[in-house]
């Protein structure tokens, strides 16, 4: 645990390790240091003294970029206030001109790390440069593989959340899923649904049924659950026996859970529709998009029992950094609050990319989730679990002795499930 406190100053971590090594020279680990400790030493040596941040100051991405910049500065001043070493930071406007020229400008300023750009096309342009001279942390994802060995990708991918939901369901013994997602022009709903389905099936699950919806939740959930087929069978039986027999419709029985891809407004219609169509006993799982980000018990009562993943920054509002941010930005960042949190983690990553890239199973317990890096140098997130109770989101307790799936721990968890009504 001497080296597994990723939010502390890495110099302090290393000093604690050196002190422990001197005091416990007879310990096997003192002479056979784990890879993560060697990576920590390297991270201290290679920590960038100057960081350039490429963000747009105008255009359609200016609002999101402003929230990211505020989060990055909040983390910077928090570290400075705690006496931790901090880099010199240069903010460069990426909304004008050639991104390669701007990148070269960052290098002339002595940048040992570049954070950004946020724009997807600009990120792809840098990713295609095989010999990027310094580590570069883009704030968006590219399509396909990056040629640049020093390029790292970080974003708030909803697909990460969908895969985490799939893993949790399998751990809890749920192997038959119904998937419900919105039809939208961007294809966002389908991408999230596909990410869940692919991971669920990789782990041995079966997607029994899936439906997309637009503006008629009652008809959509009725079709998803096969209630219409049940009613049709009853009508056929009545015609066959020529009697008005008693009948209660049933939903299809090959479903263990419903994976719901929805924003708050959509979910407030769909969950009651699921209940109406005899699915009130089914666990409903969702991504963080189901929660608006601030409690609204009067509007979210219908979501009681829905389980979803959410970033720690949204669920845990009592930290010192939250208080500092509230003083600096009393009105918050509205719909960009999660991008503010992304800025916080972008700063905290600046000294730890080396460790995450070189040490398997290493992670940063960030405010956007537990961050780890895959073989393509893409940062992946694991979020905390919550459910709606009395219309308000609450952290879900973890069963003692299980492997936690929360952002501060390991993989999937056995967690206490609420009543679905």
Residue ranges and their predicted role:
Residues 227-237, 253-255, 271-344, 358:
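Extracellular/periplasmic periplasmic-binding protein-like sensory domains
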Residues 269, 297-298, 368-421:
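Solvent-exposed, acidic/polar segments of extracytosolic/periplasmic ligand-binding ectodomains
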Residues 107-119, 137-139, 178-183, 231-264, ...:
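Periplasmic-binding protein-like
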Residues 72, 153-213:
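An alpha-beta-alpha
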Residues 144-168, 300-312:
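Short beta-strand elements at the ligand-binding edges of bilobed clamshell
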Residues 64-68, 82-144, 153:
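Beta-alpha junction/loop-to-helix N-cap segments that form part of ligand/metal-binding clefts
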Residues 327-394:
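Segments of small-molecule ligand-sensing domains
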Residues 1-50, 86-89, 107:
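Extended repeat-based interaction scaffolds and adjacent low-complexity, acidic/S/T/P-biased segments
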């Amino acid at each position: 645990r001497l080296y597994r406190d990723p939010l502390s100053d890495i110099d302090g971590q290393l000093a604690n390790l050196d002190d422990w090594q001197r005091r416990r020279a007879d310990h096997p680990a003192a002479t056979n240091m784990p890879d993560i400790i060697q990576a920590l030493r390297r991270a201290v040596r290679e920590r960038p003294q100057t960081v350039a941040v490429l963000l747009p100051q105008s255009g359609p991405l200016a609002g999101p970029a402003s929230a990211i910049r505020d989060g990055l500065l909040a983390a910077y001043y928090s570290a400075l206030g705690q006496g931790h070493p901090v880099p010199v930071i240069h903010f460069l406007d990426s909304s004008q001109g050639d991104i390669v020229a701007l990148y070269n400008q960052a290098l002339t300023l002595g940048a040992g790390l570049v954070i950004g750009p946020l724009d997807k096309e600009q990120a792809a342009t840098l990713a295609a440069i095989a010999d990027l001279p310094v580590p570069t942390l883009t704030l968006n994802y590219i399509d396909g593989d990056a040629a640049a060995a020093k390029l790292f990708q970080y974003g708030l991918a909803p697909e990460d959340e969908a895969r985490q939901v799939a893993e949790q369901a399998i751990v809890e013994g749920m192997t038959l899923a119904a998937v419900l997602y919105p039809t939208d022009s961007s294809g966002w709903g389908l991408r999230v649904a596909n990410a869940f389905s692919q991971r669920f099936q990789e782990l041995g699950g079966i997607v029994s049924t899936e439906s997309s919806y637009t503006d008629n939740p009652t008809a959509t959930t009725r079709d998803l659950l096969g209630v219409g087929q049940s009613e049709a069978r009853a009508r056929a039986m009545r015609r066959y026996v020529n009697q008005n027999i008693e009948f209660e419709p049933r939903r299809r029985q090959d479903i263990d859970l419903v994976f719901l891809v929805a924003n708050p407004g959509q979910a407030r219609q769909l969950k009651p529709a699921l209940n109406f169509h005899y699915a009130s006993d089914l666990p409903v799982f969702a991504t963080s998009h189901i929660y608006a980000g601030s409690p609204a018990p009067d509007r979210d009562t219908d979501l009681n029992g829905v389980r979803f993943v959410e970033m720690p920054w949204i669920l845990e509002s009592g930290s010192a950094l939250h208080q500092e941010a509230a003083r600096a930005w009393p009105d918050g960042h509205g719909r960009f609050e999660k991008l503010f949190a992304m800025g916080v983690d972008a700063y905290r990553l600046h000294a730890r990319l080396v460790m995450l890239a070189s040490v398997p199973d290493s992670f940063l317990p960030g405010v956007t989730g537990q961050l780890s890096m895959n073989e393509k140098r893409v940062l992946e997130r694991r979020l905390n679990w919550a459910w709606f109770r009395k219309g308000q989101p609450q952290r879900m307790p973890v069963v003692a002795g299980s492997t936690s799936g929360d952002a501060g721990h390991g993989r999937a968890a056995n967690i206490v499930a609420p009543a679905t009504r």
